[in-house]
């Protein structure tokens, strides 16, 4: 018997848009509340009994011969009666030798006690007797025959010769025959209703066949679900073991299962389906958009996160590899070449890695942050979480501060060595390079130089930066700095890189690096660096290679920014001895930021398009951006359907999500998607 509960068809169901759900009974389209039974849908008014027409949506029903029938009609048509009380049986049923009983009616005919599980049952005509009562009925004393004896077969008196005692009656030896074929029974026989039969005739007329071997069963029989088996033929399809007396068994079609084996098979089927589906790559129990969702790929015997693979530069050699194989994930770990990068545990420090390994880690982390965060820009003053950078306002005074205030959500924070001796303990950060020499990355040293020549060369840029902070009518005292100019410096997530190349052996260094790196991804990254260096020298927008022009180009690294009300800063390249000593610096152009040597300052506003990934988003009312089914509300043509929330004004954004845009962007991706679904903007 089955039950069904009506449910509301969701208007946001993915099936509602393309596949129309039709009623199984009338064929019309289902709208509103419907009933689903065996993958068939019905209107509530159409889901009725096939016999009497009563509603089945709120009651039990039976499915027989492709018809849905109520309980009463099913019992009248196909119901089973108890052999003891003659009532219809619903629920549990006990079958024995073709007879069915209620569990409460299947008791011993003599002692009226229920049969113990696994106990033997003796049938005597229409009575069933337990094993204890059957032993008391059996007597070892011979049957006393009083008076003349008559044959039960020919009804004549037995006078001379031998007589046969069978079925509690006396027979002539020649009269004890099979009722069907009249063969004299001298050996085993089977009786039914007091009439003897030979074994073959009894099986042909009343016999029971085994479902497994298709042979007749004589002796002990095992019955389950209306099917009969030899005790040795009923075996579990999984473990191939026999069933003991009284043991529970599951019947699926023609297969018999132990309860434990059936549960194990269901678990394996679910696990196999999970591994073969797309969600097998994600952690168990996670939902789509969860931060723990990890999809990995295998390229050239290396395991890469799909974000890392998608964020790699579009080099021809990368896209010539075969399609990545989907593999199972291992959370909180990253793999590169065995010779270059070892598996970093939570307690290991990056200071133990080689400079080449650090550079590969930094490139992979940078590309991963670019691909995962749309508002991130590769600049010394932008943070991945969109936090406001704080710099020293004055170009004449620098105070050393923490190198980074970010923390990685998937890695524990590691100890780093401070570049300058100070009593202040810098916050721990996974991406800080080692304290040893590294030609691919040098952290800037924020302090004033004592070198007079360096200060003279940067005087012009400093005056311009200093004058830009005051009105034209005001001339500040050069020996006095206002209180607002002293801001504690917090390092940016991406410190400027200073590359120092030797005059004669820079190409040889790259060749040696290429030979050392056996990792395919590491070799591709170094090839990209060499290609960028060679193209930067031939770039017509890059100044000639001279000490003067390189210093002029490096002046463009000074920034004047105002991000969420944070103080502006001026960082001049001449104040850093590591950068001022370099011969030239290749020009990097990423995310569309092409900075020319004449652009000394880069203005950033928290309200401009940079916050939304360098794209202008036209503002629309919230009602025009709602996502509905079947195209009832058509979206404007120029909107970004994957970023509908970015077309809202600040006031409507706060009314819809209850938070500002910057707070919304700091949320995890899965959390943002959930909020957008609730607001019908997803």
Curated annotation (Swiss-Prot):
It comes from the Eukaryota. Its main location: cytoplasm. CDD domains: LIM1_abLIM (cd09327), LIM2_abLIM (cd09328), LIM3_abLIM (cd09329), LIM4_abLIM (cd09330). It is found in: Cytoplasm. Coiled coil: none annotated. Residues 380-393, 405-425, 453-466 have a biased composition (Polar residues). Expressed in heart, brain, lung and liver. In the brain, highly expressed in the olfactory bulb. In the hippocampus, expressed selectively in the CA2 and CA3 fields. In the cerebellum, expressed in internal granular cells. Gene3D superfamilies: Cysteine Rich Protein, Villin headpiece domain. Residues 21-80, 80-140, 149-208, 208-268 form the LIM zinc-binding domain. Residues 614-682 form the HP domain. The modification N-acetylmethionine is found at residue 1. The modification Phosphotyrosine is found at residue 376. The modification Phosphoserine is found at residues 277, 280, 282, 286, 290, 337, 372-373, 379, 388, 492, 502-503, 566, 575, 606. InterPro entries: AbLIM_anchor, Actin-binding_LIM, Villin_headpiece, Villin_headpiece_dom_sf, Znf_LIM. Residues 372-426, 440-475 are annotated as: Disordered. GO terms for biological process: cilium assembly; cytoskeleton organization; lamellipodium assembly; positive regulation of transcription by RNA polymerase II; transcription by RNA polymerase II. The modification Phosphothreonine is found at residue 542. Pfam families: AbLIM_anchor, LIM, VHP. May act as scaffold protein. May stimulate ABRA activity and ABRA-dependent SRF transcriptional activity. This is Actin-binding LIM protein 3. It comes from Mus musculus (Mouse).
């Amino acid at each position: 018997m089955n039950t069904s509960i009506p449910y509301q068809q969701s208007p946001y169901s993915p099936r509602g848009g393309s596949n129309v759900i039709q009623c199984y009974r009338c064929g019309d389209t289902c709208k509103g509340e419907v009933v689903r039974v065996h993958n068939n849908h019905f209107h509530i008014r159409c889901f009725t009994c096939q016999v009497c027409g009563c509603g089945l949506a709120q009651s039990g029903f039976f499915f027989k011969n492709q018809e849905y029938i109520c309980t009463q009609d099913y019992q009248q048509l196909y119901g089973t009666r108890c052999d003891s009380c003659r009532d219809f049986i619903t629920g549990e049923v006990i079958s024995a030798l073709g007879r069915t009983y209620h569990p409460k009616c299947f008791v011993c005919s003599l002692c009226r006690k229920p049969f113990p599980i696994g106990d033997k049952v003796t049938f005597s005509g229409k009575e069933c007797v337990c094993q204890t009562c059957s032993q008391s009925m059996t007597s070892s004393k011979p049957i006393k025959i009083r008076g003349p004896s008559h044959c039960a077969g020919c009804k004549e008196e037995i006078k001379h010769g031998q007589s046969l005692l069978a079925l509690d009656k006396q027979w002539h030896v020649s009269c004890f025959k099979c009722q069907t074929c009249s063969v004299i029974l001298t050996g085993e026989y089977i009786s039914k209703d007091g009439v003897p039969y030979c074994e073959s005739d009894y099986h042909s007329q009343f016999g029971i066949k085994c479902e497994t071997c298709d042979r007749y069963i004589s002796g002990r029989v095992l019955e389950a679900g209306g099917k009969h088996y030899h005790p040795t033929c009923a075996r579990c399809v999984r473990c191939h073991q026999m069933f003991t007396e009284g043991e529970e068994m599951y019947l699926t079609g023609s297969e018999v299962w132990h309860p434990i084996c059936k549960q194990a098979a269901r678990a394996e089927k679910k696990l196999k389906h999970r591994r073969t589906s797309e969600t097998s790559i994600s952690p168990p129990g996670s939902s789509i958009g969860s931060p723990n969702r990890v999809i990995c790929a295998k390229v050239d015997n290396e395991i890469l996160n799909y974000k890392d693979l998608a964020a790699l530069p579009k080099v021809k050699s990368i896209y010539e590899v075969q399609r990545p194989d989907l593999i199972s994930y291992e959370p909180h770990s990253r793999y590169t070449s065995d010779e270059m990068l070892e598996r970093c545990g939570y307690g290991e420090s990056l200071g133990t890695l080689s400079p080449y390994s650090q550079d590969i880690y930094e490139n992979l982390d940078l590309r991963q942050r670019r691909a995962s965060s749309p508002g991130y820009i590769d600049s010394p003053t932008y943070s991945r979480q969109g936090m406001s950078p704080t710099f020293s306002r004055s170009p004449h005074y620098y105070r050393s501060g923490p190198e980074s205030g970010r923390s990685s959500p998937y890695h524990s924070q590691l100890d780093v060595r401070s570049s300058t001796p100070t009593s202040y303990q810098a916050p721990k950060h996974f991406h800080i390079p080692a304290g040893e020499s590294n030609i691919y990355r040098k952290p800037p040293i924020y302090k004033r130089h004592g070198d007079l020549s360096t200060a003279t060369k940067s005087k012009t840029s400093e005056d311009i930066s200093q004058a830009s902070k005051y009105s034209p009518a005001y001339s500040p005292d050069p020996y006095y700095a206002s209180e607002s100019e002293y801001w504690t410096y917090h390092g940016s997530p991406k410190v400027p890189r200073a590359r120092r190349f030797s005059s004669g052996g820079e190409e040889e260094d790259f060749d040696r690096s290429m030979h050392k790196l056996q990792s395919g991804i590491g070799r591709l990254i170094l090839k990209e660096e060499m290609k960028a260096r060679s193209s930067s020298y031939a770039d017509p927008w890059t100044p000639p290679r001279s000490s003067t022009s390189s210093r002029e180009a490096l002046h463009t690294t000074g920034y004047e920014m105002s991000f969420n009300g944070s103080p502006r800063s001026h960082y001049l390249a001449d104040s850093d001895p590591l950068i001022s000593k370099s011969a030239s610096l290749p020009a990097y152009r990423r995310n569309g930021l092409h900075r020319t040597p004449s652009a000394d300052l880069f203005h950033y506003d928290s309200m401009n398009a940079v916050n939304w990934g360098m794209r202008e988003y036209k503002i629309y009312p919230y009602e025009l951006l709602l996502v509905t089914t079947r195209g009832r509300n058509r979206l404007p043509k120029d909107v970004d359907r994957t970023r509908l929330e970015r077309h809202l004004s600040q006031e409507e954004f706060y009314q819809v999500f209850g938070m500002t845009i910057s707070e919304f962007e700091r949320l995890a991706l899965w959390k943002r998607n959930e909020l957008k679904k609730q607001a019908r903007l997803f």
